[in-house]
Amino acid sequence: MADITAALVKELRERTGAGMMDCKKALTEANGDIELAIENMRKSGAIKAAKKAGNVAADGVIKTRIEGNFGVILEVNCQTDFVAKDAGFQAFADKVLDAAFAGKITDVDVLKAQFEEERVALVAKIGENINIRRVASLEGDVLGSYLHGARIGVLISATAADEELVKQLAMHVAASKPEFVKPEDVSAEVVAKEYQVQLDIAMQSGKPKEIAEKMVEGRMKKFTGEVSLTGQPFVIDPSKTVGQLLKEKNADVTSFIRFEVGEGIEKAETDFAAEVAAMSKQS
């Protein structure tokens, strides 16, 4: 067995752009022969995957699965909506979802490690960066889910609710994007931050501090209602809030999870003219 030195790993990294562990593994399998390691990495798609790793993957799909009192929601990213509809990409996402559900896996790093070889092979085949971004689960008395075009997904847990009500509530969460279940669930940190913003706005109007503070109290009540599920007007019947609807039905919502494809990912704006100019210089 050849000695796999740090210098050898460094050289392979520089030549392929692959990660340190991938390079070490390739060198070990090639018994220290760097040329053979490169050839094997090319065959496996590892080099192509490494080159694609820096590409922003902000498109993709949301997948959900519920059985009984357990549900899972997953986001898998790619770079374009075209690939998001690809049968191979969809099959990969379904396979990851099945594994997450079967193993009740909520640590995305565990899923990434489990599916890294398949991900690398798919990147080589499709030609886009692919990323298992996040996974979460819910348990509860009554679970519901809703998918809006595979780009927005919701899992929701309720008590004393029928299937139709839970579906409607999941649709509401998808459309109205609440951040909390109830106004009292809004964290102290979020409340303090918004209070200061509203106080600054009120003070800028020239009002005395005492009056400004009273104005802000009213605004804060409105704010906590707007960001909480039960405080929002129900999308199907805006004449009542979700809280009023739940009271009528003697039901309650315990928790929900909402995923939207690419949310929070900064997608670089492409200057097409500059890109063409750069490509012409390379050719």
Curated annotation (Swiss-Prot):
Keywords for this protein: Cytoplasm, Elongation factor, Protein biosynthesis
Q: What gene name is listed for this protein? A: tsf
Instruction: Write down the InterPro entries for this protein, in alphabetical order.
Output: EF-Ts_dimer_sf (IPR036402), Transl_elong_EFTs/EF1B (IPR001816), Transl_elong_EFTs/EF1B_dimer (IPR014039), Transl_elong_Ts_CS (IPR018101), UBA-like_sf (IPR009060)
Q: Name its species.
A: Erwinia tasmaniensis (strain DSM 17950 / CFBP 7177 / CIP 109463 / NCPPB 4357 / Et1/99)
The UniProt GO MF terms for this protein read:
translation elongation factor activity
- Specify the protein name: Elongation factor Ts
Q: Name one GO cellular component term.
A: cytoplasm
- Where does the record place the region Involved in Mg(2+) ion dislocation from EF-Tu? 80-83
Record bears the keyword 4Fe-4S: no
Query: Mind telling me which CDD domains this protein's record contains?
Result: UBA_EF-Ts
Q: Give the family, as the similarity comment puts it.
A: Belongs to the EF-Ts family.
| Keyword hit for Protein biosynthesis | yes
List the subcellular locations: Cytoplasm
- Where in this chain does the entry annotate a coiled-coil region? none
Quote the PANTHER family the UniProt record gives. ELONGATION FACTOR TS, ELONGATION FACTOR TS, MITOCHONDRIAL
Instruction: Tell me which domain of life the UniProt entry assigns to the organism this sequence originates from.
Output: Bacteria
| Entry function | Associates with the EF-Tu.GDP complex and induces the exchange of GDP to GTP. It remains bound to the aminoacyl-tRNA.EF-Tu.GTP complex up to the GTP hydrolysis stage on the ribosome.
